[in-house]
Amino acid sequence: MAGAKEIRSKIASVQNTQKITKAMEMVAASKMRKSQDRMAASRPYAETMRKVIGHLAHGNLEYKHLYLEDRDVKRVGYLVVSTDRGLCGGLNINLFKKLLAEMKTWTDKGVQCDLAMIGSKGVSFFNSVGGNVVAQVTGMGDNPSLSELIGPVKVMLQAYDEGRLDKLYIVSNKFINTMSQVPTISQLLPLPASDDDDLKHKSWDYLYEPDPKALLDTLLRRYVESQVYQGVVENLASEQAARMVAMKAATDNGGSLIKELQLVYNKARQASITQELTEIVSGAAAV
């Protein structure tokens, strides 16, 4: 059995670690609330854009935009949103596992996959497994702006415009609540039609002013940007929630470990006292 001094040292070490994890839990909780506010502010815009585009996909358009036309699929692209920091439980790895399964489905059909990464964890993971990373951005902090993440978006849109990609997806964690974050893969291009049953059996004619091509070019690119930005802020809120939960679990586990070590310490101390008493009694008997 370890000595009492060694056990006391272990208890002090766990207590120090517990203070760190408790502080990280509180910081994550504060950041999560701010991230939720940003997410709530941007979500209505992103959802409205999705509805408008879904409505548009059912319309009889006088100008058929490139982003509305289905193609034979030979290569697909993924915009992958991950975190820059760790200590957030299985948030990243669950997302990566889902994406790897999706990519395997395509590669089994002979379709190649390109990856544009947002977040350093995704970059390091997919570089290690041999993924074809064609663009990346990292270190965006806790309050990312669209201008910071537009680089990978432009790379993938250019590839789609030039016919080097036939489908484009965004991969991110959707924030449900503090205890639940769901890895999602959503199609960006070609634009998916709305799944609203009321729209499936209707069609519309649109009038554009001043020019349908210029209007649709701007609108559809803005749609893609809005969905990517929403994916980033949702993933950020998911990250802070997952980190808060992970740090709380670490703090609680530290408390349990301290109790176990305290019990071991008490037993060691009791054994030491018993041994000392035995030695005293033996010495007295010898005299």
UniProtKB/Swiss-Prot annotation:
Q: Does the keyword Transcription regulation apply?
A: no
Please give one Gene Ontology molecular function term for this protein: proton-transporting ATP synthase activity, rotational mechanism
Matching PROSITE patterns: ATPASE_GAMMA
Q: Which Pfam families match?
A: ATP-synt
Looking up SUPFAM superfamilies in the UniProt record yields: ATP synthase (F1-ATPase), gamma subunit
Query: According to its record, what are the GO cellular component terms?
Result: plasma membrane; proton-transporting ATP synthase complex
- Membrane protein topology class: Peripheral membrane protein
A Gene Ontology biological process noted in the UniProt record is: proton motive force-driven plasma membrane ATP synthesis
Sorted keywords for this record are: ATP synthesis, Cell inner membrane, Cell membrane, CF(1), Hydrogen ion transport, Ion transport, Membrane, Transport
Q: Where can this protein be found?
A: Cell inner membrane
Indicate the segments annotated as coiled coil, or none if absent. Answer: none
How does the record describe its quaternary structure?
F-type ATPases have 2 components, CF(1) - the catalytic core - and CF(0) - the membrane proton channel. CF(1) has five subunits: alpha(3), beta(3), gamma(1), delta(1), epsilon(1). CF(0) has three main subunits: a, b and c.
Family the entry assigns: Belongs to the ATPase gamma chain family.
Matching HAMAP family, A to Z? ATP_synth_gamma_bact
This protein is called ATP synthase gamma chain
- Its gene name is atpG
